[in-house]
């Protein structure tokens, strides 16, 4: 296996990305916990253009960004009224700091769309409703994007309290107006989508929805506003007014269509991380190879491991490939064992410092106001009794950490990771290191 092929291809991709950076939504935080770079996020697949703006306001890219009609394999679970934070980066892989160029001034908004499948829905078309927006703040004399820069790229909102449970696409949007005064005008949109499952017993469905693309066009005043020579009239946000719980909604408990929609989203059944996932990178996960005690078994395991490595690199998003490189190191160890006559394995996976394993980093941000806003994040570590409360997603005998009290879920799975779904809390759950059942 010539590993340099992976390295050369990635260097070429990331070098081209550095040439022209704007911004891209890379990471979803749920209640201040990072779900991992690229995890549950629809984002552009080409690193060289991932941060480029959407200039065609009539294109399907307006829904969830470039390549946004294709879903990813993971869906992140969120609870009722959860705080969602969307991280924007000027460089998708965080190779350099920055959220967006200070010159790119303009408004922000967050939309949601209830869907039958967060993975399979194309996102294009009707059903989108706005839950928050902010344009120019007269009190601070700053545009929303300027606040975003001040807060290291974090934009945070609370999910409306009465939204019906089920699958949703959550869509943060930035609009840069620095070239809106040109001829022809060049408003620049930056957006992406997070695939989420809302665990809620509430029943409200917003009735005031719009089409994306379609809610705004090149003739809309909101995209032609001259920020360098502002008119006397205040800026008007694009799209509908934000949804207000209990006011602009209907119940989903009436009507055959609503009843059917409610029935098959009563419990999350797609996009879950398998219990046997050993390492993740964005929406990919590696499954440990079968145990072996013979030379043939060793080489079979090596082949399986390298095949998974190829898939990981092939589907790695512009946010990077840290988990792939960690998995690659595991495959190298297996291969060297086979070559050296060590036919018992596989060896224990060695996780390198800072690798994107389980894609879960406990990161705490200041509490979000009910109307949303932009906030910076900081980290925290807590411990209880003789066991430390897990902040990296790992638990069990090997590391002395419990999931009890963890932001990542209170159940410790059979393979030693924290979570809250049946895969973590059911068969094999380690009761000594968390809650089961």
Curated annotation (Swiss-Prot):
Keywords in alphabetical order:
Carbohydrate metabolism, Cellulose degradation, Chitin-binding, Copper, Disulfide bond, Glycoprotein, Metal-binding, Monooxygenase, Oxidoreductase, Polysaccharide degradation, Secreted, Signal
Cofactors named for this entry: Cu(2+)
Q: Signal peptide: which range, if any?
A: 1-21
GO cellular component assignments: extracellular region
Location relative to the cell: Secreted
Tell me yes or no: is Oxidoreductase among this UniProt entry's keywords.
Answer: yes
Instruction: Name the GO terms of the biological process aspect.
Output: cellulose catabolic process
The free-text cofactor remark is: Binds 1 copper ion per subunit.
UniProt-recorded Gene Ontology molecular function terms: chitin binding; metal ion binding; monooxygenase activity
Name this protein carries in UniProt: AA9 family lytic polysaccharide monooxygenase H
Question: Which lineage is the organism of this entry classified under, starting from the top rank?
Answer: Eukaryota, Fungi, Dikarya, Ascomycota, Pezizomycotina
